[in-house]
UniProtKB/Swiss-Prot annotation:
Organism: Buchnera aphidicola subsp. Schizaphis graminum (strain Sg)
NCBIfam families: PRK00203.1
GO biological-process terms attached to the record: DNA replication, removal of RNA primer
Protein's UniProt name: Ribonuclease H
Family matches, as InterPro entries: RNase_H (IPR050092), RNaseH-like_sf (IPR012337), RNaseH_domain (IPR002156), RNaseH_sf (IPR036397), RNaseHI (IPR022892)
Domain (RNase H type-1): residue spans on this chain: 1-142
Alphabetical UniProt keywords: Cytoplasm, Endonuclease, Hydrolase, Magnesium, Metal-binding, Nuclease
Free-text function comment from the UniProt entry: Endonuclease that specifically degrades the RNA of RNA-DNA hybrids.
């Protein structure tokens, strides 16, 4: 029987682009784990994606995962856009590579290991875990320690895949 894990995640960016961070809470029964990291130069959307990715990648086995986020970009991307992007070789209707391709490739790979239900909550409306994740993400953004290599180097810019 698969374990039920509840995940709450949020991203933050000071400047957008600017320094950013994510805060992710994983909860299994009475156990809770907090994941966070701060990046020197990144975007809010990248931090929203990174929080979910790092949470899922930290799971050691396939699980049922309930993910609560406040990012429409991530929720719509996963539930509505990703299948089309994959079919079109990760290109937009204008034949350009999608933004944040490195992260969409990672999330696309890791979601296949789990049974996921996505929940969206409105930001800054008092949802306890979302507010905690927001605070953790902002704190990490204020003290970055990691380079967002793919963003800073425009890695997928002008590349033919």
């Amino acid at each position: 029987m698969l374990k039920l894990v509840k995940m709450f995640s949020d991203g933050s960016c000071l400047g957008n682009p600017g320094s950013g961070g994510y805060g992710t809470i994983l909860r299994y029964k009475l156990h809770e784990k907090i994941l966070t990291s701060g990046f020197f130069l990144t975007t809010n959307n990248r931090m929203e994606l990174m929080g979910v990715i790092c949470g899922l990648e930290s799971l050691k086995e396939s699980c049922i995962v309930e993910i609560t986020i406040d990012s429409q970009y991530v929720k719509q991307g996963i539930t509505n856009w990703i299948a089309t992007w994959e079919k079109k070789k990760w290109k937009t209707t204008k034949k350009k590579l999608i933004k944040n391709l490195d992260l969409w490739l990672r999330i696309n790979a890791v979601i296949k290991n789990h049974h996921i239900t996505w929940f969206w909550v409105k930001a800054h409306m008092g949802h306890l875990e979302n507010e905690r994740c927001d605070k953790i993400a902002r704190q990490s953004a204020q003290s970055p320690s990691v380079k967002d290599f793919f963003y800073e180097n425009n890695f997928y810019q002008n590349k033919n895949l």
